[in-house]
């Protein structure tokens, strides 16, 4: 009997039984022992709930406009490369938390502490690879980033690549960039063209190279279901980023921040601040740097936060 014939016959028998008043009762089979199939693990109900998405410190998955950052900049080797290295990681955590608290009264949004750590350091000598850039091994940075993460400190890894492409160096630190609260900074001052040397020429980068990094970070965010990733671009003169108007700032996975690195008198800093905003794509946020030694004087929190537009990221060097 075909499948259709059996279905029709079954329906007819059921109709006859119902019409005759016969009660049809479904009997459950007696309970027996659980059947275990080797190699197959049946998940508990709770295991079927998808894991919660990772969030940024302070909550949420988009960086701005719901928060600002205050950061210590430098390298763990010591104070010569910035304020971060003036103390150990625990001391830096205490210090940057205090700095962030000083800025909070001047911001309606939460001000979160951060580190900007130089991961690759511009070098006066070419090194064995001829690239004028010293790569800090990931294993040296791992305990620092772990400690910062445990303390709720956002970390930005800064690249000073010499003759190396930014993307090549960024990939070295992918294990950290795959974390939800680690961002990236590109420092074009130290991106050399063939034949150039640090402190002889000021480096530069084209938007096409920056966009390779944007695409890489966006893909990383998608693959690991991460919150939005911060990409900081350092600049203090227009020639440092060529075709800047073509920087891809429209990817929702990446928030691009232009870090104005001008130093000197208040008038000089404000001139740099204004000049760098000319022709800036509207999706790019502005960041500010305070120098302890080169600024005369160093801006106070109140002075810094009266700058327009109000910076989303303030670093100390």
Question: What is each residue range found by the language model?
Answer:
Residues 68-74, 113-117, 155-159, 180-187, ...:
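Hydrophobic faces of well-ordered beta-strands that scaffold small-molecule active sites
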Residues 65-124:
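N-terminal-biased segments
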Residues 76-78, 119-121, 161-163, 188-192, ...:
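Active-site-proximal loop/turn and secondary-structure-junction residues that shape catalytic pockets
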Residues 29-90:
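N-terminal module-boundary/linker segments of secreted carbohydrate-active enzymes
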Residues 102, 110-190:
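Substrate-binding cleft of extracellular glycoside hydrolase catalytic domains
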Residues 2-28:
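Secretory targeting and sorting signals
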Residues 53-62, 93-109, 169-179:
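Short amphipathic alpha-helices and their capping/turn segments at secondary-structure boundaries
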Residues 200-316:
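Surface-exposed substrate-engagement region within the catalytic domains
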